[in-house]
Each structure stands twice: as C-alpha cells, then as structure tokens.
C-alpha cells in the first residue's frame, strides 16, 4: 500500500487546495466536464466553483501525479472511501502506474483525441463532410418515419458514385468477374454455360485468360506492382490511346483506385513543412487531406472561371516563385484533367505550358486523368503523356528531365465500379531507383485488390467487334454516356436560367461547379449560424429537397465567391425541377 506521513498528507493536500483557490478562472467550457465521475480532493459539499476550478487545473496537477495520489488518498481515507479505485485515469504514463503491495495494477486511461496524430485531425475531406453527414441523419430519419420530411429520399449528388445512383454495371464486366470469383464454373462445358444464358462465350474465354494471368485464384496475393499480364494490357491501351506513343509494362503500377497512387506519390515527395505541392483551386479534397497527413504545404494556383476554368501557367509560376522565396520547395504539380470539380478539359497548348513550368523548376507532375472517358461532344481529351512525348521530340533536351505520373481508375467513365477499387498509374521519366522506392511503398500494402486489377484489364480491353458481347456492351456504354450528357446539359441550362447562379458549360467529368451570388441576408444568417454561406445554401437545399451537394469552400474558391459541386448522376430530371423550385423560394426568402 502507498504510505506517507500524515503531516505530508496535509501539506500536499493543502498545497493543492491553495493552487486551486488561487487559480483565476475566466471561462469554463464543456470540455472541463470530461470526467464528472472523478472524486475531487474536496468534500462532497464543496461548492460548484471549487469543483470547476479543480477540473480546470487537473491537467497541471496530474503532471505531479505522486502528489496528487497522496492528496487524493488522504482525503478519501478520511471519508472512509477506497484510496485507489477511482484513480485509474491518472495512469497515463508507464512510470505513473499505480500498484499495490501484491503487484496488481489499475488499468490505464484510454487514449483520447489529445493522443491522436495532429495531422490526422487537421485533414478534411469535404465530399464526405458535414453536409453528407447530415444527409445520413436525414436518411435514417426517413427510414424510421417516411412522412417526417418534405421529401421521400436522399439524392447523393455529393459524390461521383455512379452505381449508388442506379447506374447499372456493364454486363460483360460482371460476367467475367463472376467466373473469376467462382472458378469452378470454368471447369464446366463452355456450351453448357452459354446455353444457360448467364454467360457469353467471349466472357468465358476472357475469364480463363485472366485466371491464367492471375495465377489461379483472385483470392491470392499478386505481385505488389500488379499482375504482369494486366500491366501489359494497360501498356497496350495507352500506346493505342496516345496514337503510337509507346508505353511499357514496367512503368505501370496497378493500384487500389487512383487515390492509392496519390497517397504513394505524395508520401514520397512530401518531406514536411519545407516541401509544397501545387494544387489547382478548386481542387479535389483528396489532395489537401493527403498533404495534411504528410505535414506538407498546399500551394494553391487558381483556375480562371471566366474562361471556362482554364489553367494559367503564369499563375502557376508566380506561386512557385513565392514558395521558393518563403523557403518552401515545390516538389509536385497536380493537374486534374478533365477537372474535378470544374469539368474543364485542357487543350494541348495549356498542357504544353504546364510542362514548361515543370521543366523549368523540376517539379514532378501528377496527371489525374480518371475522367478521360467522360468527354462531351465537341471536346477531345489529350493525355499529358502524349503531349510530353511530342514536346520531347520537338525540343530535344529541354523536357527530358520531366517526371510524370499519370493516373486512371475504374471508378469513373462508364465503368462506375467505385467499390471495386481498380486503378493504375504510369510513370514517365522516373529512374529505376525512383520506381524501386515506389514499389517498396506499394509492397507495404502487399498488392492491390486482385478483382480490381481484373477490372482494369476489362476497362482497357473491352469486347471488340466480332466478339459475342460487343454489340450489347456498346449499347450499354452508349446509353450510360447519353443519359449523363442529357442530365448535365439540363442541369447546366437550369442553373443559368436562375437568379444569382452562373455556371460554366461542362466539357467532361461528371460534375458542375456553379457560382452562386447569395443575397446579403442569407450571408448574414449563415454567419450567425457559424456556417460558410455556401454551406448554408447546401444545408437548406438538403433539408428542403433531399438533394445532397458539397459546398464550394470544401474545394477552394476565389475569396468572396460562393460555389457548390453537384454530380449529374442521379437518374431522371424530376430532382432538377425540385432544385429549381427550392432556389426560387430561397431567393424570395432572403432577397435584399
């Protein structure tokens, strides 16, 4: 048992009481009431003021836990209470572990937010932020009481998640995946499988070919860089897409979606606060969140909304120079093409100008090209890899040191297989040593999801003319694409017909990012509620119609402007009419 002379008991205890009495309390918050069950050195009749004062200074006292224990034990022994039972919260450090004479110990306090990596707490991801969280609450409310809200369902226009919004999976994809997941079917007679009308012959043959490449089972780890046969398919796809610019399988890394590739690259090139990454504003929040986790600086460059969200190379170079002056090394330049959330598509000239800056300052370029299949009529996608190769031939030596990482994913396009986590990155201009570093990082996760890798193969090598699935596969793809374009243009035209909204014409991707000139009264009420004005609008929209969007502040925007991001994935057009009605009522309510 713990022991100390009665004199020392009183001395320590009185000293603590003196500290508490002399502590000047200005404000008390609910955080001071974290552990109301803890007995204090005061008697049960102690005043509320003393109790609050004690809780305010408790962290200071606990740094001298031996004195605290003595004082606590003395007070409790006088009242006949247990000396140690409620002192477990003090055991935060090994050298303060409380033990009895028979070497028993009292369990330490659980870790709290104070123990969490600060970088994790700083990271924010608006796509699943406050508004989507509120949407989940309303969804739960509807399930309990369908009549309790002025709408009957939540429309998740906040995230590019096609199959959540009733986009059907491509039949060919799912036939092949089904056979890979249950390979016993592949041992049956092919004609019997075809006669079952569940599988077409080309899907059966493709599954057998993939199974051979994979090594016999999708349940086994693959190599960390990905299945070699699938990487060969990706290289062939890129070579064809880029009109003969050769791609090599050894430069391909299969990944668990494009997000995994972003994590790899930023983990490697972010070395702390002295390094910075150039990101477009508005941007996809994955980048700022990952930078926060890596304790590195975001170096924002603003896209020009008035010219269709174009990229200004002079703006990028200005940001680079300012970073260098502030002793921050710009290591990476992020380009999202087609844009998220803007939907803009870069011209070859704009891409060439970006490479001028990258070559001049030695920044790695991340080309986030996951929406390359989501291209609207009248627009053409040009990969950054293709433009770089052209520049290298036209200007020998000038662009030879440029390092480019190009990303693609099965989550977007007409595939929409977000939950399957398939993707790849192609490295251009990286040395063997740099590729080995990336491979080491990939190896920590062992390998990407093998069925996701198979989906990558299906994405880059769909059925071709003459195969049994070709016509039906083309029909499904065309239907998905046409419906997306119809909804996008309807929403775009609706926005531009409404008071206070201006929206750039979409060129690609699956989002619109309209600017909203909110009435002064709405801005004032938002501030009163401690919300950003665009968050206030999105919250009102959600609670009135069930349409969930993302405030523009989550993506970054020019100071003094307000935007929101919405997808146009939700089926039908009825929800667009509901939005139109809400907007008119909102402006009538808050009109200046």
From Swiss-Prot:
Keyword Mitochondrion: yes
Subcellular location: Mitochondrion matrix
PANTHER family: ALANINE AMINOTRANSFERASE, ALANINE TRANSAMINASE
Catalytic activity field: L-alanine + 2-oxoglutarate = pyruvate + L-glutamate
Induction data: Induced by alanine.
GO terms for biological process, alphabetical: alanine biosynthetic process; alanine catabolic process; L-alanine catabolic process
Cofactor(s) needed by this chain: pyridoxal 5'-phosphate
GO MF annotation, one: L-alanine:2-oxoglutarate aminotransferase activity
InterPro entries: ALAT1/2-like, Aminotransferase_I/II_large, PyrdxlP-dep_Trfase, PyrdxlP-dep_Trfase_major, PyrdxlP-dep_Trfase_small
This protein's name: Alanine aminotransferase, mitochondrial
UniProt source species: Saccharomyces cerevisiae (strain ATCC 204508 / S288c)
Pathway: Amino-acid degradation; L-alanine degradation via transaminase pathway; pyruvate from L-alanine: step 1/1
Phosphoserine modifications at: 77
């Amino acid at each position: 048992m713990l022991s100390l002379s009665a004199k020392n008991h009183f001395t320590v205890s009185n000293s603590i009481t003196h500290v508490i009495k002399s502590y000047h309390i200005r404000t008390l918050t609910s955080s001071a009431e974290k552990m109301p069950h803890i007995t204090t050195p005061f008697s049960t009749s102690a005043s509320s003021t003393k109790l609050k004062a004690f809780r305010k200074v408790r962290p200071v006292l606990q740094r001298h836990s031996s004195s605290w224990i003595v004082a606590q034990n003395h007070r409790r022994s006088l009242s006949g209470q247990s000396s140690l039972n409620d002192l477990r919260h003090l055991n935060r450090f090994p050298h303060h572990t409380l033990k009895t004479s028979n070497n028993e110990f009292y369990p330490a306090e659980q870790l709290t937010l104070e123990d969490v990596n600060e970088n994790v707490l700083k990271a924010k991801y608006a796509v699943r932020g406050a508004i989507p969280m509120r949407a989940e609450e309303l969804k739960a409310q509807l399930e309990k009481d369908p009549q309790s809200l002025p709408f009957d369902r939540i429309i998740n226009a906040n995230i590019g998640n096609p199959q959540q919004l009733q986009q059907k999976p491509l039949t060919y994809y799912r036939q092949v995946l089904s056979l890979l997941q249950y390979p016993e079917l592949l041992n049956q007679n092919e004609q019997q499988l075809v006669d079952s009308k569940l599988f077409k012959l080309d899907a059966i043959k493709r599954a057998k070919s993939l199974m051979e490449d994979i090594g016999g089972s999708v349940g086994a780890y693959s190599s960390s860089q990905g299945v070699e046969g699938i990487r060969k398919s990706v290289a062939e796809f890129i070579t064809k897409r880029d009109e003969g610019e050769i791609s090599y399988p050894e430069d391909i890394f299969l990944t668990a979606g494009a997000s995994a590739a972003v994590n790899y690259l930023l983990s490697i090139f972010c070395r702390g606060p002295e390094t910075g990454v150039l990101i477009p504003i508005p941007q996809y929040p994955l980048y700022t969140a990952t930078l926060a986790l890596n304790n590195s600086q975001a170096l924002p460059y603003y896209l020009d909304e008035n010219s269709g969200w174009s990229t200004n190379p002079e703006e990028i170079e200005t940001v680079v120079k300012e970073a260098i002056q502030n002793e921050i090394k710009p290591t990476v330049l992020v380009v999202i093409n087609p844009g998220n959330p803007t939907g803009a598509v870069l011209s070859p000239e704009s891409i060439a100008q970006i490479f001028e800056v990258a070559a001049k300052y030695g920044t790695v370029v991340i080309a986030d090209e996951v929406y390359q299949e989501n291209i609207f009529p009248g627009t053409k996608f040009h990969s950054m890899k293709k433009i770089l190769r052209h520049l290298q031939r036209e200007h020998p030596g000038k662009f030879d040191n440029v390092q480019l990482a190009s990303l693609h994913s099965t989550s977007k396009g007409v595939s929409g297989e977000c939950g399957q986590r398939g993707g790849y990155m192609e490295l251009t201009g990286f040395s063997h040593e740099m590729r080995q570093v990336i491979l080491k990082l990939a190896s920590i996760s062992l390998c990407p999801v093998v069925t996701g890798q198979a989906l990558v193969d299906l994405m880059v090598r769909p059925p071709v003319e003459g195969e049994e699935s070709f016509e039906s596969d083309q029909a499904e793809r065309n239907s998905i694409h046409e419906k997306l374009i119809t909804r996008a243009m309807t929403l775009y035209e609706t926005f531009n017909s409404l008071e206070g909204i201006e929206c750039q014409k979409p060129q690609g991707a699956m989002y619109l990012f309209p600017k909203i000139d909110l009435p002064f009264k709405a801005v004032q009420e938002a501030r009163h509620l401690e919300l950003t004005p665009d968050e206030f609008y999105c919250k009102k929209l959600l609670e009135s119609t069930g349409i969930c969007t993302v405030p523009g502040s989550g993506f970054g925007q020019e100071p003094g402007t307000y935007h929101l991001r919405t997808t146009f994935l939700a089926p039908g057009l009825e929800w667009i009419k509901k939005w139109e009605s809400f907007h008119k009522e909102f402006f009538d309510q808050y009109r200046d």
